[in-house]
């Protein structure tokens, strides 16, 4: 979708300016013809001295399988003593649909133990991912700044005592995961812990939420985004300077974040047609008899909200792909949210920010239009020069440049001011296209979700009409073929925008209306 927008905009600019504003009309008698990632040293996991003693732990024996429910202001999570894994997680502030009775967004929902998330495996220590843990917890209900902990403990057949602790805060999506091992055996053990996440592949054709879908990893100071389809070729692995790994769609994500260099490697693999697994490895651990070690992570399950992700640290906000113009998209999104705080309507906020951008760029637009007018006045003389030097292109170019110099006209004066605005356009496009704030946000009348297409296609059609009017107001000296090409652009844009988010169409529509008003004013203010 984004590629189509880029191509269409570049095409329209090229046609508008290259033919109608700069070059003279054609004369009838003159035809111008991933590979393996290198290994790197990883920082050691935080060691716990041998004087640190874990609580007395029962052997697994007949420990029963139980579900423990954690309810906060933001989500409801269900953990199982089977693997001390995450069985279900539901976001309380987001719905699957915008209408009444919509179900809450479910990020995890599994019944089979081997498909739980946040399972821990350590074969060298005898830790199996689906072992049944002991827990004295009975669930948690937290609000505001309240904190609570779920603790799970188990002893492996090798004599390794293992404890998993999940720490929650009532008003935060962050979950702190602390894992501690104690070697109660007379034998030294060496190895790594693996934290396993199972991600169900459930992309639905036509569902805007899954336009962006798959793993994202920040490794070696670079965002690595993978498509689910690419894993049919084999797994992906990262093992250098990993800050976090995540699985995301357009609006929501889950992530495992490093805590004190606790991620040594990440392996991503498609285990079957329905699941993609991330395997997060700790740095090497060496446990002498009586010694302990800890491996900690930060866990995130929640919305891809710019401010929320930034608050998690570790550059997690970079999971939102704002493209090349991220430095512009982020402040534009914050500005949009600022206006929403006063209007309580993102549609009105979009209109306000569009008006402000038009006012800011008015001097450039005025200069551009004035330059185009001056270029038009020179068209007859340029045609004469072209006829005069039709057999000597170099001489013609020199004569044209002398003409520009004599009349103090910059041939790029009409284009450059418009080119300056292109980064702002694409930045705002990205901000609107991938903003969770617009998800299920109503505007007015029939538009009840600015992240979804206009259900009756009214705004795209009106947008196409305004493009046609705007085109007619732009003076040109095109031949019939070029004129037909230009007439096709509004039609192409209209069909292209039929399935675009209505918030983005609203921006373009308002921008077109303001451009028409602006051109009307400039036409009246400039001499003929």
From Swiss-Prot:
Subcellular location: Cell inner membrane
Chain ranges passing through the membrane: 5-25, 346-366, 416-436, 486-506
Domain of life according to the entry: Bacteria
One GO term describing the cellular component: plasma membrane
Membrane topology term: Multi-pass membrane protein
Keywords: Cell inner membrane, Cell membrane, Chaperone, Membrane, Protein transport, Transmembrane, Transmembrane helix, Transport
Pfam families tied to this protein: 60KD_IMP, YidC_periplas
Cystine bridges: none
Coiled coil regions in record: none
GO molecular function: membrane insertase activity
Gene Ontology terms: biological process: protein insertion into membrane; protein transport
Record note on quaternary structure: Interacts with the Sec translocase complex via SecD. Specifically interacts with transmembrane segments of nascent integral membrane proteins during membrane integration.
Similarity annotation: Belongs to the OXA1/ALB3/YidC family. Type 1 subfamily.
Role played: Required for the insertion and/or proper folding and/or complex formation of integral membrane proteins into the membrane. Involved in integration of membrane proteins that insert both dependently and independently of the Sec translocase complex, as well as at least some lipoproteins. Aids folding of multispanning membrane proteins.
The protein's name in its UniProt record: Membrane protein insertase YidC
Species: Geotalea uraniireducens (strain Rf4)
